[in-house]
Amino acid sequence: MNAFEYANPVRVIFGAGTFSRAGEEIAKLGKKAFIVSYNDNSVSVTLEKLTALLSTAGVESTKFLQVTPNPPIEMVAEGVVQAKEFGADVVVGVGGGSAMDAAKAIVAGILYEHGDLWNMVYASHSNVTAKPPEKALPIFLIPTLPATGSEMNMCSVVSSSTLQKKSYIWADCLFPKASILDPELTYTLPPFQTACGGVDSISHVLEIFVNGQADSDLLHEWQLGVIKTIVKNLPIALKNPTDARARTELMWSATCGINGWASPGDAWTPMHQVGHVLTSRYGINHGSSLAIIMPAWMAYFKKIKPAPYERFEKEIMSIPEFKKFISECGLPVSLSEKGVKEEDIPLIVAGVKDVSFNADGVLFSNPPVTEEMLAEILKLAL
């Protein structure tokens, strides 16, 4: 196992019914809560209950409901303005990855001292000019869609509508002070969102498993265990959305997949880098982009680096079966399903290169991915 240093300060309040503690827990962090979420019926009841809980706890609140998928930095900037006008001393993110990541970007933006908020973003891996935030107001997260693991990590993924780019902010000050993970909040998720979250959760761990260190029994068992848990419980939750056990397993698996436990000493996200371009340029939902890329990536690299893929096939399912599993969950498994054609591949490769290729001209992967290799993978994904 590689040497590593690990610290995660997030206090997690987990379990059915724990949402009822939101008011008292947020009151420990501040008295003016700026709630960041969507203007959507899927969270409206939760937001009403949260406002009441905060009021009972003596916390004044206001809602910022302008979050959209793949939160644009322009929206983040507006949130910063409104949070300052309100005099917020704590920010609360409620929803899936977009809401939580927007809340993180806003909470950092309020105190940001390096100009344009896009300066926070690692927008080029080959020419790193990002000035990540050094301080932020307290942030409290309440996920309603298990997927990104934002509730227990230091990352925020945002986009630029102007630049057609999607990348991340990475800073210690983005760790939430605390998060409530109540599986009951996921019961009303639409099936498509449930499936997207499950596939995104799988991808976080799969990327570490196939790219990371090859000599750790513990990490491999942990990684495969998370994937097996999601593969088992995702179809159950899709069939019966109020299955408490399945929803609980999916929620904790999503968190554990990207809070550092499964990947100490490793940081591999090449499939995500491709997915970000599919999202920013073609509007493909994040989970769908990974549903498309994963099977093609696996099929390509099994021929080059067979060991991890053969173990995946032995312990979970074959790559063709995995592709079928994703499709049966209701997600696309080919670029053509989303209107992407072979002639678009050079543009996609150029987009990935622009943001995610290192200074040595390859995508950070194990083995490294060249432009030519990426083009071949995308052809398999057609």
Give a label for each model feature.
Residues 1-90, 335:
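ATP/NTP phosphate-donor binding region
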Residues 10, 112-215:
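A glycine/threonine-rich phosphate-anchoring loop and its flanking beta-alpha core
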Residues 77-80, 173-179, 227, 265-272:
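Acidic-glycine-rich active-site phosphate/pyrophosphate-binding loop
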Residues 80, 99-113, 152-153:
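Short Gly/Thr/Asp-enriched flexible loops that form oxyanion-binding sites at enzyme active sites
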Residues 88-104, 144-150:
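Glycine/serine-rich anion-binding loops at beta->alpha junctions
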Residues 208-324:
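Active-site segments that bind and position negatively charged phosphate/pyrophosphate groups
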Residues 314-382:
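C-terminal charged capping/lid subdomain of soluble metabolic enzymes
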